């Protein structure tokens, strides 16, 4: 078929992705080495797809808050990593339109959390203790779209180091989610927003900050990604276009002790167009609280506190109508506003 259809004609092929057998057959012909044009078309979700993704995340948020209520009630009763994975699947399965998990659940307690893509099985499964963190990276396919979320939960009293590091990761998540940027930037330009707070403390994470997410397809899907390394071919960071959905997942991993990752899904939207150019922004799709008890509030500036409070207020507003009275009371507690620092200015201040 190749010979019949392509004799004397150039062939468009993505050399980084085709298999070696096809490459050998194409080698003697004229090859136009280009990314599959449908890749970008898939990545740029249309208005209906973005709206449906928002609906999927509401369902996911409802299921996740119900799971958090269960977690809060049972953390002292000897639950395991697999118990958490199974409970999340149970709650998601109750949602209309649920199809399946979008990937194998990552539930990692304590030192397991420092293994970036650890997944529990019967041999490795451990019981949570009343200390440290459990890192939970899970997702689902619904008829409306795909979700991918990571939350790291405190299992008891945390050390100052643990709370400080959680807060550094949170600062990165908030900064990237709040980005306002000129059209034409790639993930490589934006990555520093998520890492800056960690870098200032000599910390980092050895994975990308974000990956493209498909619409009821692959949970990892290009060409958009957010990583600072300047790659080539399939690793080249694409221009972030309106409609592209990308994960926002900074983290920090302390070998032998714990791991922290906080992941939301964000969609790129047009912000404004003026004499300086086209400006983009992100809208966060994920609707699940952060663990407010794991945050060192003193490390947040006033803008970060505002972002956190606004996010939690929105979570409460959207999810609360779908909960029973006890779950609502619980949600009110875990989305409570953090206090701002009110400065008393001198009477002769010109500010």
Region spans (language model):
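Short, basic/aromatic beta-hairpin or loop at an interaction surface
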Residues: 101-114, 209-226
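Acidic/polar loop patches that form or flank catalytic/metal-binding clefts of enzymes
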Residues: 12-13, 99-100, 177-191, 203-209, ...
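Intrinsic disorder at enzyme termini
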Residues: 279-339
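Conserved small/polar residues in nucleotide/adenosyl-binding loops
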Residues: 1-5, 341-347
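Flexible, acidic/His-enriched mid-domain "rim/lid" segments that flank
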Residues: 5-100, 110-112, 153-167, 171-182, ...
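Acidic/histidine-enriched ion/cofactor-binding microenvironments in catalytic or ligand-binding pockets
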Residues: 114-144, 221-273
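Flexible glycine/proline-rich, aromatic-decorated loop/lid segments
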Residues: 25-33, 139-154, 161-169, 213-224, ...
